[in-house]
Amino acid sequence: MPSHVEKAPEMSENNAWRSVHGLLGADTAARVAFLGVPLGRESITRGRCDLAPATLRAALKRMSVYDLETGTDLSNLAVFDAGEVGVAALTPAEAFAPIRDAARTQTQTRALTILAGGNNAITRPGVHALGLRKAGLITLDAHFDLRDTDGGLNNGNPIQALLEDGLEGAAVSQIGLAPFANTRKAHGKARRAGITVHTLADCATNGFVVLVESELERLSGFCEAIYVDFDIDVIDRAQMPAAPGARPGGIAVRDFLAAARVAGAHPKVKCVDLAEFDPGRDVGEIGALTAARWFAEVLAGFAARQ
């Protein structure tokens, strides 16, 4: 180029800026996929978790692709937009196969698939998409989700259903379990199954993110793939009013976001989900912006793999 030819100036950021939403597209070669799973039926607490995927998509327009704290720039990261699974009107039992199959299509061809629920019943088909014989599961959740299945599937028993399906308890780690939010029966089930249990007190003593890192390392020792379920009710209720099951004394949102980046960075994490965000209960867009930031943090972690 002749030295006298000037480069075109960058577009003014008063007119446009690059957002995380702009990373979503139809690039079939993308190593990351985004799949909306608007499952809301059979929630123990009534709400509108089915609205969460669309709300998250809209909030991604508020997230810049640049993290000034670490210098991470997501501008060159493509995310395949796999759309939404049509399960809003279905029960968890009816939605199982459609969610499993849609997630499997992505996990078989991508390094990381991000599922946006929906209630926590999306976790069971998500884990099945990886295959029970090779998968490890970490749940970041205030609850065991070990309610009995004799009354049918709901958002309070995906872990119980997975154990009944054949997932080994030793391949399950549950972090952030809250006092006075679970039953003795569920605790006993977890112990008998061999599930690794870390309470909120454990998180306060050892560090939430440290425990997530430790369990990722433990599971990676014998699992081919790891699924991480991010139930936002693990966050302190004061910081997450849009989570029907959140309790006072939960995890700080900063730690929840840090765990998202840690999970995104781990090479054996093949699928993550965000569950139990209810836009109908949101206050001042706290939940929407937290969900969008969570998505950005997962991508920032994944970018570190490369």
Language model features with spans:
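Conserved alpha-helical scaffold segments that buttress catalytic/binding sites
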Residues: 2-306
